[in-house]
Curated annotation (Swiss-Prot):
Record keyword Ribosomal protein present: no
Keywords: Membrane, Mitochondrion, Transit peptide, Transmembrane, Transmembrane helix
Cellular component annotations (GO), alphabetically ordered: mitochondrial membrane
Main location: mitochondrion
Protein name (record): Altered inheritance of mitochondria protein 34, mitochondrial
Gene name of the record: AIM34
Paired cysteines (S-S): none
Localization in the cell: Mitochondrion membrane
PROSITE patterns xref list: SAP
Length: 266
């Protein structure tokens, strides 16, 4: 009897069906079939939203107008075409995916700050200090012109050491020589006079202000006299021309009168 009972119970566990016979309490746990439920993303109906979002947030999206929902979709980079329900579904799906992928994003951001040597040792300890290159100093060094340096090599003799060889050494030697030239000195002895060839000669002129004022006055007076003479000459000319014209007119009138009298007499 017991053997038959145990065999029936064992068959029930293997097949997943509960036998019709009575079962003791200690074997009841084996008789309940285990059900594994798996829900996929696309198996959820559109109206039944996920419980990850609060009811307040869901209510706010449902209350929004179509224009406000389009603005929300635009800020999230989603498609703005469609009905109000479709826009709400897109926003909720975006919020759900963002909350689910937040942990993965943090883990990826943490992995970016781990060096290769630490990854090789399988150590998750982050880098303590990162030194960034000085970009300003690098740009400044590129902008500054290259300077010429004199590499001093000890020569075999002292005379060769004093003689300039490179172009920069020659320019420096010329500047030193011109700086060491003494200035010009005048002496009482006219036979021995020191002249400086490169000394600049400044021509200093002494200006007499009174003489210049007198010269200006004379020039102005002469100009006035010349102008008055020209005016008088022009007046005289007009008077003479007018007088001559009057004489000619008078003589012509007298001539024509005499001629008319002679014709009348004849």
């Amino acid at each position: 009897m017991n053997k038959q009972f145990y065999s029936q119970q064992w068959k029930g566990v293997l097949t997943g069906f509960r036998p019709l016979t009575m079962v003791s309490p200690r074997f009841s746990m084996f008789l309940v079939p285990r059900r594994i439920s798996c829900r996929f993303v696309h198996s959820t109906p559109k109206k039944d939203h996920t419980t990850l979002l609060s009811n307040d947030k869901l209510a706010t999206f449902n209350v929004m107008s179509l224009k406000a929902l389009k603005n929300e979709c635009r800020t999230r980079g989603l498609k703005i075409s469609g009905r109000k329900g479709e826009l709400v579904d897109r926003i909720l799906a975006f919020e759900t995916s963002g909350s689910l992928s937040g942990g993965a994003a943090k883990q990826a951001a943490r992995q970016l700050h781990i060096s290769k040597s630490i990854r090789a040792r399988n150590d998750i300890k982050p880098v303590d200090d990162v030194r960034m290159p000085d970009i300003a100093a690098t740009e400044k060094s590129l902008e500054t012109p290259e300077q010429e340096y004199i590499v001093h090599i000890t020569p075999l003799s002292s005379s060769a050491d004093k003689k300039p060889v490179t172009r920069l050494e020659k320019e420096l030697s010329v500047e030193e020589v011109s700086a060491n030239v003494p200035p010009a000195v005048s002496t009482t002895d006219h036979d021995k006079v020191i002249f400086q060839v490169d000394a600049p000669t400044d021509n200093i002129e002494v200006v007499d202000e009174e003489a210049e004022l007198d010269a200006d006055k004379r020039a102005s007076e002469n100009f006035g006299l010349h102008a008055t003479k020209e005016e008088l000459n022009s007046r005289d000319k007009t008077f003479l021309f007018g007088f001559a014209a009057a004489l000619v007119g008078w003589w012509s009138l007298k001539f024509w009168d005499n001629k008319g009298k002679k014709r009348s007499l004849t």
